[in-house]
Amino acid sequence: MHLVRWLICLIQLWIQLGAAGSVTLLDPLLIEIPNGKLRGRDNGHYYSYEAIPYAEPPTGELRFEVPKPYKQQWTNTFDATQPPVLCMQWNQFINGTNKLLGVEDCLTVSVYRPKNSSRNNFPVVANLHGGAFMFGGPSQYGHENIMREGSVILVTIGYRLGPLGFVSTGDADLSGNFGLKDQRLALLWIKQNIASFGGEPENILVVGHSAGGASVHLQMLREDFSKVAKAAISFSGNALDPWVIQQGLRGRTFELGRIVGCGQASDSVTLKKCLKSKPASEIVSAVQSFLVFSYVPFTPFGPAIESPDAPEAFITQHPIDIIKSGKFAQVPWAVTYTTEDGGYNAALLLEKQASSGRELILDLNDRWFDWAPYLLFYRDSMTTIKDMDDYSRKLRQEYLGDRRFSVESYWDVQRMFTDLLFKNSVTVSVDLHRKYGKSPVYAFVYDNPAEVGVGQILSGRNDVYFGTVHGDDVFLIFNVSFVPANRRPDEQIISRNFIKMLEYFALSTNDTMAYGDCVFQNNVGSKHMQLLSITRDGCENKQLNCFIQRCLIFF
């Protein structure tokens, strides 16, 4: 009799925890979703369920097409214990001449759930990885830091990159933005399935860094984004950055065809058919033909404005026009930058060349007018060579005056890169959203240099001060392999505050956002633009204004 009562209580407990697909105490590693059952891994303080397909493989006839939802039914339990593969890419961080990595069949999500006996369900953070739309992957931004805090479920997403994800002829036949469409389908998958993992589908926060941050903003510019997410954060990247929306992409796409043996194609239909017949490795390896030097320009293939008659077009207007129309998702959004974000792009100029021992920055004295349009992404936006040269001349005068390019003037070059590639667009996007949007818009700037950052890594220099460069903030949230894991005490505090900020934003019932003891100021309806300044000493709300090329903070 006692045994029967015990079994009844156990069954009732199982039902309360969510028998219909939710994580249960009976076997938290075994999850059931519409495709069948999958088994994850116990990692000590968290569970992982990795490389779960959300789309049919984008290969063969599905290459350069809108992704199709994954429909296969598993007869056996799916093994979700293997890490996700990289989408095929030409990766700038690989040493040597062959930088090809990854595979074409890569459209998966990975779910990481903390062990936490005090709660059964968790808010969800969905992360879109960065990498200039050209490289990177879901494992690039590690999950250990977030799992250690034990307060949110993390979902990472693989999406098509480079030419496989972003070729476009600008018409309906080869419209482009396949990587963005992958992201969109993955977010729908999360919304529909995350409850089975113990996630709260009503509390999904979408975040991204660099190209991932720009992707978040682009996703948000679709009105239906509010159906898949509650809020969003763009770290050091937004849709208005000059490297995001590609101009001249039609010409590069046909040039790509010529390089891989499709030079006979004179229209989009013929080109697309030919490209589908070529090995993916040849298409991706052709990226190197579009680089002027090193990894410049770092985004030869990226998001494009599509033709209105394109099938399932992602965006058909420039982001500025979309924001001004007010027809975008009205969800709370935060956009950020670091004080020296441009160090990621400028640091390569300090690398000493193997052949001469000279820094590349010295060559700018003779090649500024040739290289600047590619370094700062205005090559395709200028009507004439004269316009381009005039702008290049103006930039040099504004930031360097009459000084020469040298190691001594590097700091001002880096400041130029920060302003033009990251900082100015934050001010413009916040201003536009506060004028034409209804939901809260927040901003913050991070100023606390890491001991080792991408500046030192990309330049190979430890004798130069780079300041707070690209990633110094977000790498305190997501651990990365190329940055030392040991952190200063102040960074450990900031890391916990950042992760708590994500949880708070995902759970907020009144759309507010906070970091530590500081509450972000909503810019919608405010007289002045506000941003939160975060340093090793704490946080403080400040006023933000912008004059021509430079954004100044008034205390």
UniProtKB/Swiss-Prot annotation:
The active site is at S210 (acyl-ester intermediate). Pfam families: COesterase. Residues 1-19 form the signal peptide. SUPFAM superfamilies: alpha/beta-Hydrolases. CDD domains: Esterase_lipase. GO terms for cellular component: extracellular region. It is found in: Secreted. Glycans are attached at N95, N116, N479, N510. Coiled coil: none annotated. InterPro entries: AB_hydrolase_fold, CarbesteraseB, Carboxylesterase_B_AS, Carboxylesterase_B_CS. Its EC number is 3.1.1.1. GO terms for molecular function: carboxylesterase activity. It comes from the Eukaryota. Disulfide bonds join C87-C106, C262-C274, C518-C539. The keyword Nucleotide-binding does not apply. It catalyses: a carboxylic ester + H2O = an alcohol + a carboxylate + H(+). Keywords: Disulfide bond, Glycoprotein, Hydrolase, Secreted, Serine esterase, Signal. Belongs to the type-B carboxylesterase/lipase family. This is Esterase-5A.
